[in-house]
Swiss-Prot record:
Gene name tied to this protein: psd
Post-translation changes: Is synthesized initially as an inactive proenzyme. Formation of the active enzyme involves a self-maturation process in which the active site pyruvoyl group is generated from an internal serine residue via an autocatalytic post-translational modification. Two non-identical subunits are generated from the proenzyme in this reaction, and the pyruvate is formed at the N-terminus of the alpha chain, which is derived from the carboxyl end of the proenzyme.
Sites of Pyruvic acid (Ser) modification: S226
This protein's record includes keyword Chloroplast: no
Membrane topology note: Peripheral membrane protein
InterPro entries listed in its UniProt record: PS_Dcarbxylase, PSD-B, PSD_type1_pro
UniProt source species: Bacillus anthracis
EC number: 4.1.1.65
UniProt KW Cell membrane keyword: yes
Enzyme kind, highest EC tier: lyase
Name listed for the protein in its UniProt record: Phosphatidylserine decarboxylase proenzyme
Broad class of where this protein is predominantly found: membrane
C-alpha cells in the first residue's frame, strides 16, 4: 500500500510543467533570495566554494558551483580508481551473470540501466558501486580513471527520488530514471559511469565531448542532488576494503584498485 501511494503521489507531481517551473525558478535572479537559507539548511561548506555566497546570483549557480583550487587532490597511483564525486558511498557488490545486482533489497537490471543486452553483457560478472549526492554536496562529476570514451548516451524521461524513500518505493530509480551514461575503455577494460537524474530538476549537463578523459578531469554536473553508478568489467577492480555504506567520500579519493595494475 505504501509503495502504491508513494508512486501515485510522485506521478501526480513529477510532470514536465513542475520540472520546467522549478528549473526556471532556480535559474532566475528571484531564487537568490533563498540562497542564504538553502546554504544554512543544507550546511554547505562555504570555505571550499570558489566564490563567496553573495556572489552567486541564482540557485542554479550555487548548485553547480566550483571549488577553490587545491581543495581536492586526485590519487595519482596508476592502479587507483578514484571517486568521481563528493558524496555518500551507498553500496557495492557483484553484478550477477544474469546482468543484475541487488541494492537496498531491490533488484536492478543492467540491461535496463544501459538500454540493451549488448552493452550489459560487457559487465556480467563484474562490479558495481553506487555513490549518492545530497543537495549539500559539490555537484560536478569527474572521471574516475583515464581512457578513451567509447559511447555517450541518454536514457529515461522522468525521475523518482534517489533518497531512502525513493530507493525503497520507487520504480527501480537507478535503472529507470533519466540518466546520462559515459562508457570508457581504459587499457582494454571497460567502465560505465551512469549519472542518474533527480526528481523534478531532471538535468545532467556534459561539459565536453572529447574522445578521451583523464583521471580527475571534469566531465559533467548535476543541477541538484542525485546518484552516480559505476559499472566495471569482470576481474577489473578490487574495491577498497575499508569502504563502508554511509561513508562520506571526496572527489579524487581512492575507492578501488585496478587488478591488472597491482
Amino acid at each position: 500500500m505504501r509503495r502504491t501511494l508513494y508512486r501515485l503521489m510522485i506521478e501526480l507531481t513529477n510532470g514536465r510543467f513542475t520540472s520546467y517551473t522549478l528549473r526556471k525558478f532556480a535559474q532566475s535572479r528571484l531564487s537568490s533570495i533563498i540562497i542564504p537559507s538553502y546554504a544554512k539548511v543544507f550546511q554547505i561548506n562555504q570555505d571550499e566554494m570558489e566564490k563567496g555566497l553573495k556572489e552567486y546570483r541564482t540557485l542554479h549557480e550555487l548548485f553547480t558551483r566550483k571549488l577553490k583550487e587545491g581543495k581536492r587532490s586526485i590519487d595519482t597511483d596508476a592502479s587507483s580508481i578514484v571517486s568521481p564525486v563528493d558524496g555518500v558511498f551507498a553500496d557495492h557488490g557483484p553484478i550477477e551473470d544474469t546482468k543484475t545486482f541487488d541494492i537496498k533489497g531491490k533488484r536492478y537490471s543492467i540491461v535496463d540501466m544501459l538500454g540493451n543486452e549488448e552493452r550489459a553483457q560487457r559487465y556480467a560478472g563484474g562490479t558495481y558501486m553506487v555513490i549518492y549526492l545530497s543537495p549539500s554536496h559539490y555537484h560536478r562529476i569527474h572521471s574516475p580513471l583515464s581512457g578513451s570514451v567509447t559511447e555517450r548516451f541518454v536514457l529515461g524521461r522522468k525521475s523518482y527520488p534517489v533518497n531512502a524513500a525513493g530507493m525503497e518505493y520507487g520504480k527501480e530509480p537507478l535503472s529507470k530514471n533519466y540518466r546520462s551514461v559515459t562508457e570508457v575503455n581504459s587499457d582494454g577494460e571497460h567502465m560505465a559511469l551512469v549519472k542518474v537524474g533527480a526528481m523534478f530538476v531532471n538535468s545532467i549537463e556534459l561539459l565536453h565531448e572529447r574522445d578521451t578523459v583523464q583521471k580527475g578531469e571534469e566531465m559533467a554536473y548535476f543541477t541538484f542532488g542525485s546518484t552516480v553508478v559505476l559499472l566495471f568489467e569482470k576481474d577489473m577492480i578490487e574495491v577498497v576494503q575499508e569502504l563502508k555504506s554511509g561513508q562520506e567520500l571526496r572527489l579524487g579519493e581512492k575507492i578501488a584498485t585496478r587488478l591488472a595494475h597491482k
